[in-house]
Amino acid sequence: MLLRYQDQTNDFCLVRVQNGIKETYVIYQDALFAFVQIYEDPSAMQDSLRDCDFTSNDTAKELWTSSCGFDINWSYRCNINRNFGYDDSSPCLVLTLNRIFGWLPESASGVQVCCDGATPNDRDLIGTLCFYDALVHDEDGCDRRCGTFPHQYYPYLNQDSYQPPAVFLEVRYPKKNVLIRIQCWLDNMPNTQQVEFAILID
């Protein structure tokens, strides 16, 4: 699993923000802005993209020649107009899966990515974790501990204009002035590596 929000040079990532000082978090905003551009580029909206029925557990034959579109508005509060939450100390991050040619999820419900504080103390300080994705993209995203990469986006076969599914993670109002460690993992895929990062809002 790949955690997307900045150039990652090691296995542990720190998001550090000084509240109200944009220079301290513009690097994260810029990285997220660049990420969402692949979904907003009109040239990407070709005949090979289609609207998908995410309530169906059946693998459609068309998946092998086309791919599902991903509506960037599904990011809900994690959007450009809100500067991805960094202005009000509720930073957003993006979780994606690496593209593996021909791979299919074992579960017909897709792949779940779950996140929580790394320790009980972190869980007390973390505030609220909200997951916005193709299935849930409103306040209900704050009532769960996992987001979903729907199975309809797989397999990846180098389709034209393929748009990988994303899960937008909002860390809503975490405790300030303390380092908070967060772990994310794939819930229904054993033997996959966890992603760990930390947030510090001064």
Positions of predicted regions on the chain:
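Glycine-rich, often proline-containing surface loops adjacent to acidic residues and nearby aromatics
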Residues: 91, 163-166
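Compact beta-sheet-dominated globular domain cores
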Residues: 166-202
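Surface-exposed coil/turn segments at beta-strand junctions on protein surfaces, enriched
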Residues: 88, 162, 175-177
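Intrinsically disordered, low-complexity juxtamembrane tails/stalks of eukaryotic membrane proteins
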Residues: 2-132
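Eukaryotic intrinsically disordered and solvent-exposed regulatory patches
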Residues: 78-82, 153-155, 168-170
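An almost-null, non-specific background feature
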Residues: 37, 48, 77-79, 102-106, ...
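Extended, solvent-exposed segments with strong compositional bias
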Residues: 124-164
